[in-house]
């Protein structure tokens, strides 16, 4: 099984019951196609970069799941057929991202910077 992530945007004017119904149907598709849902996040309503179907705002959802090609095809088909969903994008992830603690920080030693010697200004007076 491969890991995928999907972000979809729903219309901003939907009620809580409709939003729960949409997320339940998405979860149902993943489970029915023998996928494993890792994460489902509601990112809330945000301003869109440009108007989509006369909407300036949208409610964003983020999914991360394991599945096969048939699952992603069926999920995208269902997202496309739902007129309450105005955009979606699915991406195949190469592998699980390592935790930040697992990546060693690159340590560099800094040499102390010595202050530049102050320049002395000499003034000469001309004698007649």
Curated annotation (Swiss-Prot):
Compositionally biased spans, kind Basic and acidic residues: 117-128
One Gene Ontology CC term in the entry: cytosolic small ribosomal subunit
CDD domains (UniProt xref): bS6 (cd00473)
InterPro entries: Ribosomal_bS6 (IPR000529), Ribosomal_bS6_sf (IPR035980), Ribosomal_S6_plastid/chlpt (IPR020814), Transl_elong_EF1B/ribsomal_bS6 (IPR014717)
Role, per record: Binds together with bS18 to 16S ribosomal RNA.
Encoding gene, per UniProt annotation: rpsF
Organism: Geotalea daltonii (strain DSM 22248 / JCM 15807 / FRC-32)
Highest taxon in the source lineage: Bacteria
PANTHER family registered for this protein in UniProt: MITOCHONDRIAL 28S RIBOSOMAL PROTEIN S6, SMALL RIBOSOMAL SUBUNIT PROTEIN BS6M
HAMAP family cross-referenced by the UniProt entry: Ribosomal_bS6
Keyword terms, alphabetized: Ribonucleoprotein, Ribosomal protein, RNA-binding, rRNA-binding
Ranges for region Disordered: 105-128
Protein name: Small ribosomal subunit protein bS6
GO molecular function per UniProt: small ribosomal subunit rRNA binding; structural constituent of ribosome
Similarity comment: family membership: Belongs to the bacterial ribosomal protein bS6 family.
GO biological process, one term: translation
